[in-house]
C-alpha cells in the first residue's frame, strides 16, 4: 500500500452532533470502522488528507490507517458530503484483509466519439463488481468510438480488469447511441413550448 493512502486516525471518545461539529471544525472527519466481526470503532481522520485520497483514487479508495501505532487496511465504503458546503461530514470504513473479495460500485467513464449525427446517452453511471479488496479498479472505461445509431452497450459487454467479476444485471444498459436531434426537431420543440406558454394565459382569462 502506498504511503499516500496512509492516514493517522484518532479514536473518538466523544459522540453526538456537537462532538462531530467540533471534530470537523478541528479539521477531522468522524468515521466508523467496522467488519470481520469486530466491534465498530469510532475514529477521526484528517479531512484534508482524506479528501485528497478520494480525489486521487475515487470513492472506493483503500486506506492504511494508523490507529494508536497499529496499521489497519480499510476500504472507503460510504462518504456523506454536505449538500451545500461540499465538505465531508462522515465516512464508513470497512476492515479488509489481503486476498479478500469485496463488492463495490465502480464509476463508468465513456471515451471516444460516436459517429457523426449521433448522441451518446449514458444510462448507468456506475456498475457493481466483485474484486480483490486491494485491487479495486478506479473506473471502467467504455469506448464509443465510431459507434452508429442504435448501438447499445450492456453490462455483460464491459471489459473488466483481471480478477473482477460482474455483480450487476448482465442486461443492464450502460450506453445507448441514438440519433442527435436536427435543427428542425429543435425548432418544432421550441414552437410547441411557446404555444403551450401562450395558451396558458388565454385559459386563465377564460376562467376569470
Curated annotation (Swiss-Prot):
Low complexity bias: start-end ranges: 196-208
A GO cellular-component term linked to this record: cytosolic large ribosomal subunit
GO biological process terms, semicolon-separated: translation
Keyword Ribonucleoprotein among UniProt keywords: yes
Stretches for region Disordered: 185-208
Entry-linked CDD domains: Ribosomal_L25_TL5_CTC
Pfam families in alphabetical order: Ribosomal_L25p, Ribosomal_TL5_C
GO molecular function: 5S rRNA binding; structural constituent of ribosome
Protein keywords: Ribonucleoprotein, Ribosomal protein, RNA-binding, rRNA-binding
Biased composition annotated in UniProt, kind: Acidic residues: 185-195
Coiled coil residues, start to end: none
The keyword Ribonucleoprotein is assigned to this record: yes
Alphabetized NCBIfam families for the sequence: bL25_bact_ctc, PRK05618.2-1
Recorded family membership: Belongs to the bacterial ribosomal protein bL25 family. CTC subfamily.
Function, as annotated: This is one of the proteins that binds to the 5S RNA in the ribosome where it forms part of the central protuberance.
Oligomeric form and interacting partners: Part of the 50S ribosomal subunit; part of the 5S rRNA/L5/L18/L25 subcomplex. Contacts the 5S rRNA. Binds to the 5S rRNA independently of L5 and L18.
Protein name: Large ribosomal subunit protein bL25
Species annotation: Rhodococcus opacus (strain B4)
Gene symbol of the encoding locus: rplY
